[in-house]
Amino acid sequence: MWAENSVFYQIYPLGFCGAPKENDGVTVNRIGKIADWADHIQRLGADAVYLSPIFESDRHGYDTRDYRKIDCRLGTNEDFAKVCETLHAHGIRVVLDGVFNHVGRGFWAFKDVQEKKWDSPYKDWFHIHFDGNSNYNDGFWYEGWEGHFELVKLNLRNPAVVDYL
């Protein structure tokens, strides 16, 4: 496998590109900064870039809102495609870090559960108990990853969740 013989250069794009700590909803092409470093990465002998989470998130990237678009604080999917083209032109592969065992509280299916409670078709996407309350006063209790309630654990035994991912 190619990865076994590769030299990786890891980047945490939200920090590297100077994105705001909180998602303000404003789209700014900051991810292009990575393309500016392609020559440097190549000179170091790295032939792969490992990008920490770039998907739309509430704050730090590990609290995903949308797996289908990059964080607006980094730009658009088209901006990211251009970065990939530049890196590929330098012989550098791109590997994404995706978090698929939990999402952020801003994830669309969790927002639906917050609004509709028992009536949400997505209530079984998470480990939810309607006989308790969360630290955020949601009117139900749910499992947070490692006890962090801003990171809502997905129910990976649910085939609909697996199909979505």
Where would I find each of the regions flagged by the language model?
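Acidic/aromatic-lined carbohydrate-recognition and catalytic surfaces
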Residues: 1-164
